[in-house]
């Protein structure tokens, strides 16, 4: 990491002074913000809120998204406590949870929404986010109670947590007659909100894929 920082510094120094100054000011500002966030974690939340608002998300959705971030953090903390390795093992368990509640792996889910490198959770509806949170929060709680030791036991725990949310999804769909999982991504969901505000579509959201 230190070597990378030195390379960045050398690259900046190689830029003519008058051209490098704006970039140096930007780096200083970013550094200041990170220090402030370390001192006051609430600033991280405030800045995340501001970023999502600028992207056109509703406050209701943003509240759920920020909560989802916290739920995910609690889950990964629990995985760390159980000796789960970051990277491949995290990805495997995440896929098990996703498959158990949505019927798809993370990659399949992203393909459905036409995503490549974009964050899947940033492209979920409020209900999708809530069910994903339920799956992850339940997995965390089951893990705390059962204290899995082996990776195989962690896989079973992930499947159990995901199944709880999967059952909830099926119950919701049975009551509404509408699939919870949608192919709409963030851009399409934002356009629906704009259309509703401008009166182009009915607030009830009659689109079969909504």
Task: Walk through the language-model features, giving the residues of each.
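Positively charged, phosphate-engaging catalytic surfaces used for nucleic-acid and nucleotide handling
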Residues: 12-210
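Short, small-residue-biased leader/transition segments that mark boundaries at the very start
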Residues: 3-8
């Amino acid at each position: 990491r230190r070597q990378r920082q030195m390379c960045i510094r050398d690259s900046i120094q190689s830029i003519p002074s008058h051209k490098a100054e704006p970039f140096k000011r930007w780096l200083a500002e970013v550094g200041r913000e990170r220090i402030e966030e370390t001192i006051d974690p609430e600033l991280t939340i405030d800045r995340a809120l501001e970023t999502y608002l600028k992207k056109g998300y509703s406050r209701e959705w943003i509240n759920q998204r920020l909560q989802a971030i916290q739920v995910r953090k609690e889950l990964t903390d629990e995985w760390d406590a159980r000796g789960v390795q970051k990277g491949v093992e995290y990805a495997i368990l995440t896929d098990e949870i996703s498959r158990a509640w949505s019927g798809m792996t993370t990659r399949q889910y992203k393909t459905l929404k036409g995503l490549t490198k974009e964050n899947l959770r940033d492209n979920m509806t409020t209900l999708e986010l809530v069910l994903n949170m339920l799956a992850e929060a339940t997995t965390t709680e089951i893990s705390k109670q059962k204290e899995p030791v082996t990776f195989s036991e962690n896989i079973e725990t992930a499947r159990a947590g995901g199944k709880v949310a999967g059952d909830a999804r099926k119950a919701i769909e049975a009551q509404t007659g509408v699939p919870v999982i949608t192919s709409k991504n963030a851009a399409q969901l934002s356009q629906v909100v704009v259309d509703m505000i401008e009166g182009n579509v009915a607030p009830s959201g009659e689109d079969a894929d909504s």
